Structure formats: C-alpha cells, structure tokens
C-alpha cells in the first residue's frame, strides 16, 4: 500500500512526517528522504497538506530531511499529490 510513493505519516506519539514510503509492517513504517512536519501553516489539516501542499511555506517549520527513519507508531498514511510533494520539499529548512 503506497510503497515507493511520497506520503505523510502521522504517528500516535512521534508526530507527523513526510517522505518516500520504503516499507510498512503493522504500525512500523520506514521512510526515506524524510522530513519531520514540526509545524505547518497554510493547510487546514495534514490531509489538505497531502492534497494541495502549504499556501504559507514561509511559516512552516520543517527540519532538514534525514536519509531514513523508522516510525514505530504509525496510525495514518496519506499519499501526497505531486503538487503537495513539491510544496513540502520547497519549504526552507528550519533550525533552532
């Protein structure tokens, strides 16, 4: 399901992530080229973020991507449109 697609994953406690779905087994999801969606603006929900992207990229807080991450508490996986993927990837890297 959605393997090799760019997706948004919501974890029960770990948060929200966007990346390329490498594998899924139960509640464990492995993403590559992954960004944590620490704070978003310009989309009403992560569903809207997956469909249209952000209308306010300058307000979003997405740290730098990591090569690979294993999310052990995935409760939602939403495939992204090409426009949404481009929008998420275009957000400037946020650092503290």
Regions found by a protein language model. Give the residues of each.
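Conserved RNA-binding domains used in RNP assembly and mRNA/RNA metabolism
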Residues: 1-96
